[in-house]
Amino acid sequence: MTFSVDKVRADFPVLSREVNGLPLAYLDSAASAQKPSQVIDAEAEFYRHGYAAVHRGIHTLSAQATEKMENVRKRASLFINARSAEELVFVRGTTEGINLVANSWGNSNVRAGDNIIISQMEHHANIVPWQMLCARVGAELRVIPLNPDGTLQLETLPTLFDEKTRLLAITHVSNVLGTENPLAEMITLAHQHGAKVLVDGAQAVMHHPVDVQALDCDFYVFSGHKLYGPTGIGILYVKEALLQEMPPWEGGGSMIATVSLSEGTTWTKAPWRFEAGTPNTGGIIGLGAALEYVSALGLNSIAEYEQNLMHYALSQLESVPDLTLYGQQNRLGVIAFNLGKHHAYDVGSFLDNYGIAVRTGHHCAMPLMAYYNVPAMCRASLAMYNTHEEVERLVTGLQRIHRLLG
């Protein structure tokens, strides 16, 4: 099927609105993507005609809701090519998924004197949980440094591993630079040293196919809201043998086998023992619709369209005076930049006046900002519904700002 951006855009109601009297150019999907009608309708239909609490209910609505929820788990497992749907845990998003691993697997496997490796380009969600774990147990946090072009200094990686390395926690794609890390060689090296690997896939799964079996990662986590799905829902993949060994990190209903005041509590099997309480069933239904929508379009077709759009954007941005781009030419999804010495907030405010939505600030990546010695950056992100015309509007807007501000 030929990819048609016009047909895709017609599925997203918000893209027809105006901002400041101008058509909206939404270039902020890396923060959170817009939702197609198919996702909105699926979640609304569930709440209108199918809502009930899942698990243990013998009535029809509960049984149907439970079946729908578990079908989404199966769909998500196919989406990332997991061996089994039971390797997938529903979480609130990438942040909760990483915290789950840190507080369950981490508390059980990382000891004083051990070390964890991350990189200088990580989102705070893949830094802070490991800082907290290391502080709790007396472990060391080691950091892969950056090159100026936004790639990792991979030649340093072998020197960071030793017999005390327990985990490599690495982003698949940088949320600021768009750098796609060479996961295959990094994962192989980690496993050679007996370390596990967690991959933050929040910025990858919407741009091209992901195969967790081919990657051979131990943990992979992503959010639904960046994948055109609802907020408050995400997926944590864990290799089955690891998941079965991990203790729960939250207690409550749905995650127990038995509860006794005199004999204590026993847990149900994974993945359900990591899903305490009433789940975000509506969000799960919406996530399933998003996965179905993206899969029907074809991730390879999406990738081809987005890469062509990215190449066009980078070539057009060369015409903007005093524009600093961060990262290399070969990138996925995002373009981080600053215009002259003007603060990113000022540039972003002007662009908003022109109906163009970009993200401004430190992008939950303060160590990365420190590396480039800037307080903030503007970030334009390109998704499957963005157009060449919107890229041209961004370029024209930046040229206009440069003329106004100098």
Swiss-Prot record:
GO terms for molecular function: cysteine desulfurase activity; pyridoxal phosphate binding; selenocysteine lyase activity. The modification N6-(pyridoxal phosphate)lysine is found at residue 226. It is found in: Cytoplasm. The active site is at 364 (cysteine persulfide intermediate). The keyword rRNA-binding does not apply. Its EC number is 2.8.1.7, 4.4.1.16. One of its GO terms (cellular component) is cytoplasm. PROSITE patterns: AA_TRANSFER_CLASS_5. Signal peptide: none annotated. InterPro entries: Aminotrans_V_dom (IPR000192), Aminotrans_V_PyrdxlP_BS (IPR020578), Cys_dSase_SufS (IPR010970), PyrdxlP-dep_Trfase (IPR015424), PyrdxlP-dep_Trfase_major (IPR015421), PyrdxlP-dep_Trfase_small (IPR015422). It catalyses: (sulfur carrier)-H + L-cysteine = (sulfur carrier)-SH + L-alanine; L-selenocysteine + AH2 = hydrogenselenide + L-alanine + A + H(+). It comes from the Bacteria. One of its GO terms (biological process) is cysteine metabolic process. SUPFAM superfamilies: PLP-dependent transferases. Pathway: Cofactor biosynthesis; iron-sulfur cluster biosynthesis. CDD domains: SufS_like. Its cofactor is pyridoxal 5'-phosphate. Keywords: Cytoplasm, Lyase, Pyridoxal phosphate, Transferase. PANTHER family: CYSTEINE DESULFURASE (PTHR43586:SF25). Homodimer. Interacts with SufE and the SufBCD complex composed of SufB, SufC and SufD. The interaction with SufE is required to mediate the direct transfer of the sulfur atom from the S-sulfanylcysteine. Belongs to the class-V pyridoxal-phosphate-dependent aminotransferase family. Csd subfamily. Cysteine desulfurases mobilize the sulfur from L-cysteine to yield L-alanine, an essential step in sulfur metabolism for biosynthesis of a variety of sulfur-containing biomolecules. Component of the suf operon, which is activated and required under specific conditions such as oxidative stress and iron limitation. Acts as a potent selenocysteine lyase in vitro, that mobilizes selenium from L-selenocysteine. Selenocysteine lyase activity is however unsure in vivo. This is Cysteine desulfurase. It comes from Shigella flexneri.
